[in-house]
A protein has these predicted regions:
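Structural recognition of the conserved hydrophobic beta-strand(s) that form the central parallel beta-sheet
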Residues: 2-4, 184-187, 211, 236-241
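Conserved C-terminal RecA-like helicase domain
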Residues: 312-437
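Conserved helicase ATPase motor motifs in RecA-like P-loop NTPase domains
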Residues: 113, 215-219, 231-248
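Inter-Walker segment of RecA-like/P-loop motor cores
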Residues: 157-196
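Conserved RecA-like ASCE ATPase "motif II neighborhood" in helicase/translocase motors
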Residues: 183-213, 218-227, 435-438
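Interdomain helical connector at the RecA1-RecA2 junction of SF1/SF2 helicase-like NTPases
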Residues: 249-345, 360-377
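ATP-dependent helicase/translocase motor core
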Residues: 1-138, 147-162, 179-180, 189, ...
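Short basic/glycine-enriched coil/helix segment immediately N-terminal to the Walker B
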Residues: 100-105, 134-135, 177-180, 196-209, ...
Length: 438
């Protein structure tokens, strides 16, 4: 569905909210000169050239249009591609078909966070398997976080493909040894033998394997990345990243496509990050006991190294201190209720550690309770107290076998609780359990 206003045109679907209609800013594989060489080119001109030419329109319908469950619980919604997703998939397929060597067939996709990389990866799967020359490829997804793995699996359902989960090292080896054209999902740490000294084996020499690595900048510069390349030496590797660093290009080659933060903000896909400095006056209690404990643990360490350790761990201890967190939590609640909550928005707090996250929950709840009592006596700004009283604070942290269960309660590390809280957080107020702060 296309909406127009004067010279501006945007693409969406019958289920799209207005904010999800987007301009089509690149007519790829055409250039602007294909539209006109002697007149001003409008937004409408670019969209018509980029989406309504016969080949592009058919591809948008067959490859790029998806049906997914509405995260707001409103049933099934229809999703149209954004121009950078269409362009990237086309470039990946072109490179895979035209490159001479595996390194020439792969490369880096730099798409900023929140721009739909998971959908782009699944649209690539569709495009590969619809191409007669490439339909025999095995496609391997590699990620380094369970959240990303789950996101890719959920996205795969929307395109009608089943992903084989390499839930163990041995299962991974079995799946990669075959030349069957299927989808395999693996966490990067599966590319490591249980015994550190043991080398990871060569598993498949086929050049009909496409490896797509999500958030590649985080994982590919150590032995695990080397093992991946050793296991599949002739595979084509496409690295997706939202925050590229120098080593990404050194490892995976040149860029296939770029979609930067600035472009994303200009397109309204992501919001601009605004930084506001805050100060507080909290002081640590029992400093003498803290220093004594430090000396007890590090008494045998040389003075220079001790200073380095003290600088690193004193700062972390400071950020985890209950007094500091309580002071910050009070300031956060004050700012949130004054500037954010009245606009219907929720809030996220990123902590320095899991311990700090758990402590923030307690202190935010305390600060919220105090603020509500204050507003019950004096509510000159007419804050919605009924909704505010339902507001909940949730903790989302990962578990560890070494956890102190008294500190990290099961509910804090339980994936089912995580999913429930995240779903609630994504819903607007009035349509959820009112998880307002994560």
């Amino acid at each position: 569905m296309i909406v127009t206003s004067k010279q501006v045109a945007k693409l969406g679907t019958i289920t799209s909210e207005y904010e999800h209609f987007n301009e089509w800013k690149d007519p790829y594989p055409y250039g602007l000169s294909d539209i006109s060489e002697d007149k001003t080119i409008t937004s409408q001109d670019v969209l018509v050239q980029g989406t309504l030419t016969k080949g592009n329109l058919l591809d948008i319908l067959r490859i790029f249009t998806l049906f997914v469950e509405d995260p707001k619980g409103m049933g099934v919604i229809k999703i149209a591609p954004r121009y950078q997703q269409f362009r990237t998939v086309k470039k990946i397929v072109k490179r895979v078909k035209e490159g001479k060597m595996p390194d020439e067939k792969g490369g880096i996709v730099w798409h900023t966070q929140g721009s739909g990389k998971s959908l782009t990866m699944m649209q690539t799967v569709r495009a590969i398997y619809r191409d007669p020359e490439l339909s025999g490829f095995k496609i391997v997804f590699v990620t380094d976080r369970e959240q990303l793995e789950k996101q890719l699996k959920d996205t795969s359902k929307s395109v009608g493909y089943t992903i084989h989960d390499a839930y163990s090292i041995e299962k991974l080896k079995d799946l990669l040894k075959t030349d069957t054209p299927d989808l395999v999902m693996a966490m990067i740490h599966k590319f490591q033998e249980r015994e550190v000294e043991e080398e990871f084996p060569l598993l498949n020499k086929s050049d009909k394997i496409l490896v797509m690595i999500d958030e590649a900048h985080r994982t590919q510069y150590n032995i695990l990345g080397a093992n991946l390349r050793k296991a599949l030496p002739n595979s084509i590797k496409v690295a997706f990243t939202g925050t590229p660093i120098g080593k990404t290009e050194q490892t995976f080659g040149d860029y296939i496509d770029k979609y930067t933060v600035r472009q994303s903000v200009e397109d309204g896909v992501t919001v601009e990050i605004v930084y506001e400095g805050r100060t507080h006056s909290a002081e640590l209690s029992d400093e003498e006991a803290t220093n004594a404990k430090f000396e007890d643990v590090f008494h045998a360490v040389e003075a220079e190294e001790k200073q380095r350790i003290m600088g690193r761990f004193t700062w972390r201890a400071y950020l985890e201190a209950k007094e500091v967190i309580a002071d910050k939590a009070k300031d956060m609640i004050e700012h949130y209720i004054t500037h954010v909550f009245p606009n219907g928005f929720k809030a996220q707090v990123v902590a320095v550690s899991r311990l700090a996250a758990v402590r923030y929950k307690e202190k935010l709840e305390n600060a919220l309770e105090e603020k509500i009592k204050e507003l019950e006596e004096n509510n000159t700004k007419n804050i919605d107290l009924d909704t505010l009283k339902k507001l909940k604070v949730a903790v989302i942290i990962s578990g560890s076998p070494n956890d102190d269960t008294q500190v990290f309660k099961n509910e804090y590390v339980n994936e089912h609780e995580h999913d429930k809280n995240i779903r609630s957080f994504k819903l607007p107020y009035g349509k959820s359990d009112e998880i307002g702060i994560n």
